[in-house]
Amino acid sequence: MATQLIDLAQQTRAAAQKLGTLSLAQRNDALAKVAQALAANQAKIVAANQADCEAAQRDGIAPALYARLKLGESKLQGAIAGIHDVINLPDPVGHLQLHRELDQDLVLKRVTCPLGVLGIIFEARPEALIQITSLAIKSGNGVILKGGKEAIQSCTVLTEIIQTALQDTAVSPQAVTLLTTREEIKTLLSLDQYVDLIIPRGSNAFVQYVQQNTTIPVLGHADGVCHLYVDVAADLSKTIPIVVDAKTQYPAACNAVETLLIHEKIAPEFLPQIAAALTAKQVTLRGDAATQKIMPVQPATAEDWRTEYSDLVLAIKIVPDVEAAIAHINTYGSKHTDGIITEDAATAQIFLNEVKAAGVYHNCSTRFADGFRYGFGAEVGISTQTLPPRGPVGLEGLVTYKYHLVGNGQIAATYSGPDAKPFTHRDL
């Protein structure tokens, strides 16, 4: 199996090298044909996904994972529309970032270029395959995909349709490869000679496993423990819809809020209101001791502050001020997305400056942490690392850059020693 996978990786790398040289028009043409093929085969895709869903239900799949697995017509159509959004995005390849004369006839350029081959490992979410493949092709990268076993039929059908569509384009079908067995993950993680970036999308434990078992750079986040802090100066009529949306609009999402922090001065008034709104949406509430004194809720433990529920569960804590809220978030948060609700601009700015997260919001739902909503067309994942790329990662995170230096016989010795010729260092 290892030898076969190495052969596939070599083929993908060769296809990626050619893909990286194609024009924007050629890459966009390939994407348009992929979108057309997916649209023409919607019934086939939905049927394959339905078979996956039925098998998953027989196996007792968790509700949060089932929600990710389910690919209905609307979700599929949204993914196809996302391909057209990617087509309309600027070309990330060949972008001139620096153009500088070092000396006469010695010119330096920094130019963006594809990474090479992406290894994408994801659980459930078959539409992620569509999003990632479109971004990979647009950015000139090959991609090796490994979906979860629960989505095997969906991913197989999607990949077959995409590869068939690419046969009529300048992009080789071998630029997109699908792995189908769990055993292949370990081998994939060892292919640092052929794979340039690993992007895992899945549970906390799964992402940590990937991070700990490869020498290939990893882009991703291990969990999404997101917070909202309701300040003493919050407009409660604005606050309730924000909190309800952040928790219930899609609770399985990594940008759904998991902990609600409330300023102690407004807690007696606000808690009953938000509790009524959330329980009407079947949300289970867990609270600290101060919360329990105001209303009956399940006790929150220390473990709750670190938990990504991915479900209709919300932990609540009452805090004395914004600094306490920031301290809690920076201690227990996952550096994903955290927000403040307040009409006090100075307090909001303190929060925006001091919370150590990829996304820090003011007066809006955490659910906006998404590449599509940011106008990236789609995203390959969300990175919570401090170094870039950070937050929702779209095309800009799938390219690197190289330096082109064009001279006319210059040598380094001319520019060193007591009679060194000075550089001009003039931006062009």
UniProtKB/Swiss-Prot annotation:
InterPro entries given in the database record: Ald_DH/histidinol_DH (IPR016161), Ald_DH_C (IPR016163), Ald_DH_N (IPR016162), Aldehyde_DH_dom (IPR015590), G-glutamylP_reductase_CS (IPR020593), Glu-5-SA_DH (IPR012134), GPR_dom (IPR000965)
Location (main, coarse): cytoplasm
Compartments where located: Cytoplasm
Associated pathway: Amino-acid biosynthesis; L-proline biosynthesis; L-glutamate 5-semialdehyde from L-glutamate: step 2/2
Physiological role: Catalyzes the NADPH-dependent reduction of L-glutamate 5-phosphate into L-glutamate 5-semialdehyde and phosphate. The product spontaneously undergoes cyclization to form 1-pyrroline-5-carboxylate.
Pfam families, alphabetized: Aldedh (PF00171)
GO molecular function list: glutamate-5-semialdehyde dehydrogenase activity; NADP binding
Enzyme's top EC category: oxidoreductase
CDD domains xrefs: ALDH_F18-19_ProA-GPR
Keywords, alphabetical: Amino-acid biosynthesis, Cytoplasm, NADP, Oxidoreductase, Proline biosynthesis
Catalytic activity: L-glutamate 5-semialdehyde + phosphate + NADP(+) = L-glutamyl 5-phosphate + NADPH + H(+)
Gene that this polypeptide is encoded by: proA
GO CC, alphabetical: cytoplasm
Protein family per UniProt: Belongs to the gamma-glutamyl phosphate reductase family.
E.C. number(s) listed in UniProt: 1.2.1.41
Protein name: Gamma-glutamyl phosphate reductase
SUPFAM superfamilies to which the protein is assigned, alphabetical: ALDH-like
A biological-process GO annotation: L-proline biosynthetic process
